[in-house]
Amino acid sequence: MKIGIIGSGVVGPVLATAFLKEGHDVMLGSRSIDKKELVKWKNENETGSVGTFKDAAQFGEILILATGGSVTESAVRLAGVENFANKTVIDTTNPIAQTPPVNGVLKYFTNVNESLGEKIQQLIPEANVVKAFNSVGNALMYKPDFEGIKPTMFICGNNEEAKKTVTSILDSFGWETEDMGKIEAARAIEPLCMLWCIPGIAKGQWSHAFKLLKK
C-alpha cells in the first residue's frame, strides 16, 4: 500500500521506517522538506520518499496523522482537506496542551466530553478516521518485545472497513487490537496517553504498554 505520513517529529519517522520494513511504499511529509531530521531519515531509508504535508496526503492511500496535537488541525489544512476524502486516516495524536505537566500528569486542551479524534473527523468528514498508536511511546510502536506477550492497542472510528485495515496493520506490527467503537470513544482512549506518560515523567520509566485481560 501507499502510506502518506503527515508529521516528521518523533512519531512520523518511526512509523515510516516500520511501514517500509513491512513492504509498503512510504512518503514522509513535513512542513519543511529541508528539515535536518527529514534529510537524515531519507539518507537512512533510500526506498522511502519525502515531501510536504500536501505531497504526502496526495500520495497515500492510507494516511497517518503524526503531528503534535496542538498543530494537527493546521497540518490537515496545509495538507488539503480534499486529499483525505475516502481514505483511511490513522490518527496517532493526543491533545496535549503547551503547558508543563503537574506532578507527572499531562494537561489536555480538550474536555472530558470531546476529543481531538472527533475534531479531526469533523474537519475531514469524508475521511475514515481511526484513532490508534496514541497510547504508547514511539520506541514501542513497532514489534514491541514483552517476552512473547502482545500488548493491546485500543482503536476507535466510525468506519468498520477502515478499522479492519488498521487492525491488520497493527497485527503485522506485533499488536493485539481492541475496537472500542465509534470515534466518540477517543474521549476515553486519548487519556491513556496521560496514564502511559506518568511513570516516564515521574520516574524515567518508558518501557511499558497496556494489556486488556479478558475471561
What does each of the following model-derived ranges do?
Residues 1-42:
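NAD(P)+-binding Rossmann beta1-loop-alpha1 motif at the extreme N-terminus of oxidoreductases
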Residues 23, 59-61, 127:
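Short, well-ordered alpha-helix to beta-strand connector turns
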Residues 44-88, 94-102:
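Rossmann-like NAD(P)-binding element
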Residues 50, 90, 128-134, 178-180:
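General beta-strand structural signal in soluble alpha/beta enzymes
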Residues 93-139, 143-144:
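Rossmann-fold NAD(P)-binding glycine/threonine-rich loop
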